[in-house]
Amino acid sequence: MQWALAVLLAFLSPASQKSSNLEGRTKSVIRQTGSSAEITCDLAEGSNGYIHWYLHQEGKAPQRLQYYDSYNSKVVLESGVSPGKYYTYASTRNNLRLILRNLIENDFGVYYCATWDG
């Protein structure tokens, strides 16, 4: 049986010493299980450093999935996160995208991006 999966996308304000503004669009999407979804994180001009992706599910603490090291153009996964589940890439200098692959019911939640330097 195919279940419809709702993935709610949102953005977390940056929170650290030397923060950059994120310009996020909050939206929700519904995708079929087994399909993919894409989340966009728009960064303010001149943003650099580390861009973090989080998942917050009801009743649980937010979980960091991965971060993108813009200095070295590489993605670092959190321990326990499946390497094939998420794909992150910089589509432009001020735009980072996260692709969620092979969606399952447990992927439901609020996805956030946040950035800071140092």
From Swiss-Prot:
Task: Note the InterPro entries from the entry.
Answer: Ig-like_dom, Ig-like_dom_sf, Ig-like_fold, Ig_V-set, TRG_var/const_region
Q: Between which residues do disulfide bridges form?
A: C41-C113
A biological process (GO) of this protein is: innate immune response
Predominant subcellular localization, coarse grouping: membrane
PROSITE patterns in the record: IG_LIKE
**In which compartments does the protein localize?**
Cell membrane
Q: Which residues form the Ig-like domain?
A: 18-118
UniProt xrefs under Pfam families: V-set
Q: Which residues cross the membrane?
A: none
Q: Which residues form the signal peptide?
A: 1-17
- Biological function: V region of the variable domain of T cell receptor (TR) gamma chain that participates in the antigen recognition. Gamma-delta TRs recognize a variety of self and foreign non-peptide antigens frequently expressed at the epithelial boundaries between the host and external environment, including endogenous lipids presented by MH-like protein CD1D and phosphoantigens presented by butyrophilin-like molecule BTN3A1. Upon antigen recognition induces rapid, innate-like immune responses involved in pathogen clearance and tissue repair.
Q: This chain belongs to which protein, by name?
A: T cell receptor gamma variable 2
The lineage, from the top, is: Eukaryota, Metazoa, Chordata, Craniata, Vertebrata
